[in-house]
């Protein structure tokens, strides 16, 4: 989908589809699997549509959030995307993880297409683009380019060492050896 062209012009609309489907067991029908975000200058809105896995043949629309945003918030979001994708260079692609697809439309109605893995975030002015979007839109569950870290992973741990150990619990042993 990426057409190899950095964004140019004045950004007026963005559409970001984040899909969490990855290698592994089939999700439960009520598991949220896809989010679609649309931000538009013309409508001065941000719209987030959330889809569940359903029966696997077609995702089921679960929730839709539509918010009228201030002109400043819309400008901040679009300026961030203009800057990030004017100098865009593709990053590595992880084939067993989720993915994102982005379409940016400029004031001349030219469309620019980008894609990547749902774990590769971007930085803008030293801040995560995904985190900045979540903050401006006040949608903490927004995935964008990289889902927010789950706070539950840290629950009950007193040190960073305990969190690190969570990732090293699988040990392969030969039968009969301790």
For the regions a protein language model found, what residue spans apply to each?
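N-terminal glycine/threonine-rich, aromatic-flanked beta-hairpin/loop signature
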Residues: 43-54
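Short, well-ordered, aromatic-rich surface patches in folded extracellular/luminal domains
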Residues: 1-30, 34, 56-178
